[in-house]
Amino acid sequence: MVRYRTRSLSERPHEVHGQQVHGQDQGHNGQEEQGLSPEHVEVYERTHQGHSHHRRRRCSQRRLHRIHRRRHRSCRRRRRRSCRHRRRHRRGCRTRRRRCRRY
């Protein structure tokens, strides 16, 4: 009973939905694929590349360089303090150096 109901309910919407979508999309896509889709693809590629390059330029030149310097200086200070405060635990300094190098 349950299996038969789930199959019938799942098959009917897919068939009806698939026919409606294909029937409507064939008329629109026939026109859009020839004239509008290449234009949309080109515009989308240009805008997408422009945004990605624009963001990368800002982050790589200004922000990341400054942030890396700040982190590097702060990490040096923290290393000295941690090493002076914890002379016995040398493993902590090594793990912190590895973390700083990753950034």
Swiss-Prot record:
List the residue ranges of the region (Disordered).
1-103
State if Phosphoprotein is listed as a keyword: yes
Biased composition annotated in UniProt, kind: Basic and acidic residues: 8-17, 39-48
- Tell me the GO BP annotations in alphabetical order: chromosome condensation; nucleus organization; spermatid development; spermatogenesis
Phosphoserine, modified sites: S8, S10, S37
In which broad location class does this protein mainly occur, judging by the first location in its UniProt entry?
nucleus
InterPro entries found in the cross-reference section: PRM2
Q: Which UniProt keywords apply?
A: Chromosome, Developmental protein, Differentiation, DNA condensation, DNA-binding, Nucleosome core, Nucleus, Phosphoprotein, Spermatogenesis
Q: Where in the cell is it found?
A: Nucleus; Chromosome
Q: Is the keyword Nucleus in the record?
A: yes
Q: Name one GO molecular function term.
A: DNA binding
Give me the stretches of Low complexity compositional bias. Answer: 18-29
Q: In which tissues is it expressed?
A: Testis.
Cysteines engaged in disulfide bonds, as pairs: none
> Which Pfam families does the UniProt record give?
Protamine_P2
Give the top-rank taxon of the lineage listed in the UniProt record for this protein.
Eukaryota
Alphabetical GO CC annotations of the entry are: nucleosome; nucleus
Q: Compositional bias of type Basic residues: which residue ranges?
A: 49-103
How does the annotation summarize its subunit structure?
A: Interacts with TDRP.
Q: What is the annotated role of this protein in its UniProt record?
A: Protamines substitute for histones in the chromatin of sperm during the haploid phase of spermatogenesis. They compact sperm DNA into a highly condensed, stable and inactive complex.
Annotated PANTHER family: PROTAMINE-2
Protein name (record): Protamine-2
Species source reads Erythrocebus patas (Red guenon)
Source lineage? Eukaryota, Metazoa, Chordata, Craniata, Vertebrata
